[in-house]
Amino acid sequence: METNVNPLAVILVYFDSKGDRLLYRYPYQTLGQTEVANDEQRKSRKRNPYAVANTDDLLQTPTHLGAAKSQGQLQGFADEVLSALFAVKPQLCNQKFELKLNDVRFVSHPTLIPQKEQRSGPMAKQQMLINIVFALHAQASYSIVKCYHELSKRLGLALKFEEQRSGYLTEQTAQMARTHDEQQQQPLERTLELIAERCSLAQALRSIFHDLCTTGLLSTSLNHNLTLCFCLPAKAHQLHKKGSMVDPETIDRCLRALKPYHGMLLLVDFAELLDCVPPTGARMLWQLVDVYDPLISLQSMSSNADLSIEHVYKLVSHLVYWAKATIIYPLCETNVYVIAPDAPLHTKSHLVEKFSARFAGMSLFEVISDFSLPTSIGHLTTPLQQPARQGILAQMVIWMLQHHLLMQLHTYVQFMPSEDEFGDSASCSNHLRDAISDEEGDQEPDADELHGSMLSMSSHPLPVPAVLVGGHRREASEDHSSLASDNIAVQPSSSHKSNFSITASMSTDNCDSLDSMEDEQKLKELLQVFSDADRAAIRRIPASANVDDLSLLVKLYQMGYFKSEHHLEEIMYFENLRRSQLLQLLDKFRDVLIIYETEDPAIASMYNTK
């Protein structure tokens, strides 16, 4: 659930030689105040005489104590109790701390920080414990808990750095403790408000809490020196697709599948990109942004920006993690898109007005209706259209991709020969035999004509009938040879040149015969990679007699491209093939190859609603 992502509270606990103390918490509503008001309201109600008495086990802890209320605030815990719980022993410091009380889960990373050395006096360096605790719903997933622990760890390291640099933490904690002592007679809520006004650390914690509850993106400055950047993916990705719970593990799986032929699509304006990187990394990010184009691949952007492909991978991965960009295949005419099944296309969707404001005079429903069925961009454009019209269509497709209204379909290939090919071959053989017998009619062929291998029959597309010469019946082969010999005998051998031409043609026939024998041997070697059943199915395809076609088929088969795990764009990139060349091969061997279209599983998994 979305509510399980938001924190209930952020708590700052401090411990040194003087003891432990809860210095700050936010939200700072008085603990137990709401429970008292609710109890008084329940008592003031008129009791129903027919109400059933509560017979709950008295040994169980009442659920309202320490419960996370619907308002999303932590209530029912006293400051003294929380301070004693979170001021852990040194043995538990510098590691993950997790505690579950009723329906609240507390997550932190206690950090031991040595105090800055005093210049005067040989005093021994003292250590203090700082523990920034996040209160979460007990039902929060493991990935969410892991993210909050990482944030607590980073805050501890940042405060440790500032303490060693300028004594920042000692100054802030002393000011908080002094404010508590001065405001002992005041309500706790007023004391915490005054601390937030005086202490920059309290202001930073309050800002962190608000950012976690709204965008999930943090860019907080500590002591006006150190910038802390953090992203809560489960919250940040909901800004672009409401209801999508994206955890870091899913993003990592997607980014591990990143290839040079992929492209990048920014989801925000350029001005918002600097929020996700510290100032030291802004220069390299702008190098990539200057050459950004959704029409080119990451490899092309790497070359144009004069960056290595590894640096481009890291920058793109960072932008995807921070929900600033998404992975696509570069926009081109052959890309196939279809309406996303969970696209918010109801009549009152805010995207309708947003689309009309972006593209004046255009209707979102009218434009997106062209993608009701899987359609390529090339099918929606014609050569007669003006380039400006084609550019507007590309911009509209980009806009719909940014708002997750469209999804791209890729073509995958599965090698799957038919199981009844032998039966089909036998029926085809019987059909050919019946055709031969019907065509010859009541002619009585010799027994030798009805025998022969299937290969010899298939080599002759049409049966050659017997002919009558001089009232005697002869076989077609005999007649053919006799006619050939007669033709040679009739033609006068008037010159040596004619004899030489006959000899040359005979030598050419011999060379062709040798080439055909070599091709036949190579075909047999190529077919050895298949099983007997698959080999028989491939032999029935006419294209299997072509050495080049069969060689390419065997190569792609051995590389594992026909297991529904690689789409055509990936095959084209890694094997350096043209799309037309690959499509022709798939068409020639369509009897043993199944082709289907679906979205890329690695990219699609990021925005599956959970």
Swiss-Prot record:
One of its GO terms (cellular component) is autolysosome. GO terms for biological process: cell division; cellular response to amino acid starvation; cellular response to starvation; germarium-derived egg chamber formation; meiotic cell cycle; negative regulation of cell size; negative regulation of TOR signaling; negative regulation of TORC1 signaling. It comes from the Eukaryota. Keywords: Cell cycle, Cell division, Cytoplasm, Lysosome, Meiosis, Mitosis, Phosphoprotein. The modification Phosphoserine is found at residue 437. Residues 474-501 are annotated as: Disordered. Disruption phenotype: A high percentage of mutants die as pupae or pharate adults. Under nutrient-replete conditions, larvae display a significant increase in TORC1 activity. Adult escapers display a small but significant increase in body weight and a reduction in climbing. Newly hatched males have a decreased tolerance to both complete starvation and amino acid starvation, likely due to decreased triacylglyceride (TAG) storage and the inability to down-regulate TORC1 activity and activate catabolic metabolism and autophagy. It holds the Pfam family NPR3. It is found in: Cytoplasm; Lysosome. Residues 482-501 have a biased composition (Polar residues). PANTHER family: CGTHBA PROTEIN -14 GENE PROTEIN (PTHR13153), GATOR COMPLEX PROTEIN NPRL3 (PTHR13153:SF5). An essential component of the GATOR subcomplex GATOR1 which functions as an inhibitor of the amino acid-sensing branch of the TORC1 signaling pathway. The two GATOR subcomplexes, GATOR1 and GATOR2, regulate the TORC1 pathway in order to mediate metabolic homeostasis, female gametogenesis and the response to amino acid limitation and complete starvation. Component of the GATOR complex consisting of mio, Nup44A/Seh1, Im11, Nplr3, Nplr2, Wdr24, Wdr59 and Sec13. Within the GATOR complex, probable component of the GATOR1 subcomplex which is likely composed of Iml1, Nplr2 and Nplr3. Interacts with Nprl2. Belongs to the NPR3 family. This is GATOR complex protein NPRL3. It comes from Drosophila melanogaster (Fruit fly).
